[in-house]
Amino acid sequence: MKLNPLILGLLLSFSAGHSLADVVLKVPENIDLLSVNMQKPKSEGGLFGDKTIMLKDGTNQIVFRYIPTFDDGDDVKKVYSDTIIAKFESENATLHFKIPSYRNIKEANEKIQTMEWQLVDEKGQSVALVEDKLLNPGVQWGRNYSQEATEYNQNGGVAAIGYLKVVTNEAQLSENTTQVIMSEASQPLEVVGSSNNLTQLQLWYSKASKEERKAFKKWMVDQE
């Protein structure tokens, strides 16, 4: 599929206009952030302190594990929580994880799978969120958490977010005919096809405001 240069130009303007995120998520060393909005997280800092994740205003989804560490003689041992997937909504805020602490490995092993946690702002106010566990009964090493989050959202889990779905009509592929279904939700979920342009379309559309999305949809209709 070949995108009209005007579409790409419009999408580039969306990206430039929204390069500065409005929500800052602080991620401590004992939180393993695995996916953000179905994509590999891009963080700043974090060598000897919290990592910083920049997010857009509105609804976001994260996948993470809590991994507290404990001294055991000359060794350091870790305890792993289940993989948690959660969605939350926030605007113009800096958010921090509020997680339990455990006295020892025994207590961590007993309680970590049922732990209660929160995201709080700089005033200590908790952010409303919906959480679930992203479980995989198979081999845990090498899991593709962003792909698992995408499939989770497609299946409509309790912590699912919406998506932009682009489906290529293979029966009319020679005519480059594509059906585009625009969602009012915030992130891409499924792409059938191999075009890099479609991936860029997903990314830029997800960063656009509601007003820009409406204008973009109207522009697309006018091109037909």
Swiss-Prot record:
Keywords in alphabetical order: Signal
InterPro entries recorded: UPF0319
UniProt signal peptide: 1-21
Pfam families per the UniProt record, alphabetical: DUF2057
Family of the protein in this entry: Belongs to the UPF0319 family.
The protein, known as: UPF0319 protein VC_1853
Organism: Vibrio cholerae serotype O1 (strain ATCC 39315 / El Tor Inaba N16961)
